[in-house]
Amino acid sequence: MMKRQLHRMRQLAHTGSSGRTPETAEFLGEDLLQVEQRLEPAKRAAHNVHKRLQACLQGQSGADMDKRVKKLPLMALSTAMAESFKELDPDSSMGKALEMSCAIQNQLARILAEFEMTLERDVLQPLNRLSEEELPAILKRKKSLQKLVSDWNTLKSRLSQAAKNSGSSQSLGGGSSSHTHMATANKVETLKEDEEELKRKVEQCKDEYLADLYHFSTKEDSYANYFTHLLEIQADYHRKSLTSLDTALAELRDNHSQADSSPLTTAAPFSRVYGVSLRTHLQDLGRDIALPIEACVLLLLSEGMQEEGLFRLAAGASVLKRLKQTMASDPHSLEEFCSDPHAVAGALKSYLRELPEPLMTSDLYDDWMRAASLKEPGARLEALHDVCSRLPQENFNNLRYLMKFLALLAEEQDVNKMTPSNIAIVLGPNLLWPPEKEGDQAQLDAASVSSIQVVGVVEVLIQNADTLFPGDINFSVSGIFSGLAPQEKPNSQQVSEELAPVAVPATAATPTPTPAPTPAPASMTVKERTESELPKPASPKVSRSPTDTTALAEDMTRKTKRPAPARPTMPPPQPSSSRSSPPALSLPAGSVSPGTPQALPRRLVGTSLRAPTVPPPLPPAPPQPARRQSRRLPVSPCPASPVISNMPAQVDQGAATEDRGGPEAVGGHPPTPVLPPQPRPRGLISETD
């Protein structure tokens, strides 16, 4: 038994990948062998297609027409529409459209149900029979033939072995071997009968298998027609659906033809402005300058040239969206956006960026880059002029218009903080960008470098707008924005005449009285008096001019949070004279003596008053008794105290410091260093006491 199984495994192992088996290959010709190889792939194909096609059905499989239609999603949609248009006015356009849509969805659902029923009958069921009945029967008969052939071969090998054993027993002879010979002969006869029976079965199974192969080869074309019929059914379904949709659409358009021709719907069409090429936009509207460019420029010229951070600060998304819609639908009502110059600047940048081709054209991109790479200013300017002359006429006109405006904007850089460099940084990438090419990181790096060169090109165009684009320009080209007038710069002479002169009190000529020295209390000892007379270290003084002080005060004021003031209508008047120091504070009657230092109020901190760099004058020392001369030491004259001798100079110097900001401003020489009082010898103190 184990030998038979091992032999069977060997036969299966010898079966090639082509599907040929040694049991059946000897009975089949070359044509039938090829047909046999197509059995397994055909069975798998029919099974997979049937499974996936069954999943595409939307209705209930095997149900009748009415049940199938109720389960379709299109029928559910039709029911929802029928319930919805009952609440609407049947004479309204929406009610009529919804009613028509409900009817067409119901019709499409029935067409779909018919399509699925035909698909099941003509495609799904034949494919199921082919994959589950016909081809499995042929493959089953093939396996039976293989088993019979294997058993027949095994029986033949046993028969040959038994015949060989019977011949060897006859050659040996003997009485005892006669009985063995008879048993062997009977076994051989039995094996011959079994072999004849198996041979008959093999022949019968072989004939049936060959007939199945011939039948499959003749019906293989009809099996292929299943897939052709599938496409025909689908085409017929879509054709019927399209016919129904065309009929419904024609009827729906006829019903709404009067509504479409009403005055409300025949108003000025919603013209496309953003995202359209410049040439198409100009041809459709019959303009020389693009509508967004002219409208935004006039809005900014009206109110916005002195807005700080223009084109750099972003506007609100909702305001910008509403502005773009208004510009496309009703450009005459744009004056309401004058109060938001940042939204207007954002709309201009958005238009330039959404152009299919940049305003400075992609065809001249390399020429712009070559002109920007020139180091010599004259050569670079000449190259840029040459590239500008090769622009298309509509691009040149709009670029000239825009550069003239940006040059005017740069003239207000002291107020709006937008220099030509800042304007080029924020607008350059919107005027010119490299052509889109799919590449590696190296090309991306090159694009970033080119953006820097684009900024350089735009900056030079702004700085030399009068040279590259000579002649004056009228910004109101179309005349539809007549209500937007550019801001007129006020004349400085008229402003100075209208404003009254402001008198500034000059305190520099009035000398500040020198505080009188305060006498020390009598109870203070000599040592304490000596320590109190020592000069204290003064804080370092930083000399600032009145202009620097004013700038510092304005900077500190700018850093603090404060509500935005109303926008001025004219620039502030120019100061007629330089600022002078504030007037000296007058002491009220009954206050402390002038010698006592007073603290300044907080409102004066940060003004031109500064702390003196020279210490206050020391009080005069009380008269000391004459020292007794020591007998051992020579008599030495007592020098006068340097503090006492220098006191008048210090007083004068301090007064000059307060008036003019420092001792350097009085005489132009640094002050003489003050020597501290010298300590007296301990022996002399004791003798004096």
Curated annotation (Swiss-Prot):
UniProt lists compositionally biased (Basic residues) regions at 1-11
**BAR domain sequence ranges:** 17-262
Annotated region (Interaction with CD2AP), positions in chain: 470-689
Which regions are flagged for Pro residues bias? 565-575, 613-625, 670-680
PROSITE patterns documented for this protein = BAR, RHOGAP
Compositionally biased region (Low complexity): 576-594
Return the Gene3D superfamilies for the record: Arfaptin homology (AH) domain/BAR domain, Rho GTPase activation protein
Q: Does the keyword Phosphoprotein apply?
A: yes
Q: Where is this region: Disordered?
A: 1-24, 507-689
Question: What InterPro entries is this protein classified in?
Answer: AH/BAR_dom_sf, BAR_dom, RHG17/44/SH3BP1-like, Rho_GTPase_activation_prot, RhoGAP_dom
The Swiss-Prot or TrEMBL record annotates one GO molecular function as:
GTPase activator activity
Specify the Rho-GAP domain's residue ranges. Answer: 276-469
One of its Pfam families is RhoGAP
For the modification Phosphothreonine, which residues carry it?
T596
**What positions carry the motif SH3-binding?**
611-620
GO BP of this protein: actin filament organization; cell junction assembly; cell migration; establishment of epithelial cell apical/basal polarity; filopodium assembly; negative regulation of small GTPase mediated signal transduction; phagocytosis, engulfment; positive regulation of GTPase activity
User: Per the record, what is one GO cellular component?
Assistant: bicellular tight junction
**UniProt comment concerning the protein's domains:** The BAR domain mediates interaction with the exocyst components EXOC4 and EXOC8 and is required for the function in cell migration. It also mediates the interaction with PLXND1.
- Kindly state the subunit structure of this protein: Interacts with RAC1. Interacts with the exocyst via EXOC4 and EXOC8; required for the localization of both SH3BP1 and the exocyst to the leading edge of migrating cells. Interacts with CD2AP and CGNL1; probably part of a complex at cell junctions. Interacts with CAPZA1; recruits CAPZA1 to forming cell junctions. May interact with AFDN. Interacts with PLXND1; they dissociate upon SEMA3E binding to PLXND1 allowing SH3BP1 to transduce downstream signal through RAC1 inactivation. Interacts with ABL1, GRB2 and SRC (via SH3 domain).
> What is the protein's known function?
GTPase activating protein/GAP which specifically converts GTP-bound Rho-type GTPases including RAC1 and CDC42 in their inactive GDP-bound form. By specifically inactivating RAC1 at the leading edge of migrating cells, it regulates the spatiotemporal organization of cell protrusions which is important for proper cell migration. Also negatively regulates CDC42 in the process of actin remodeling and the formation of epithelial cell junctions. Through its GAP activity toward RAC1 and/or CDC42 plays a specific role in phagocytosis of large particles.
The name this protein goes by in its record:
SH3 domain-binding protein 1
Q: Supply the source organism for this entry.
A: Rattus norvegicus
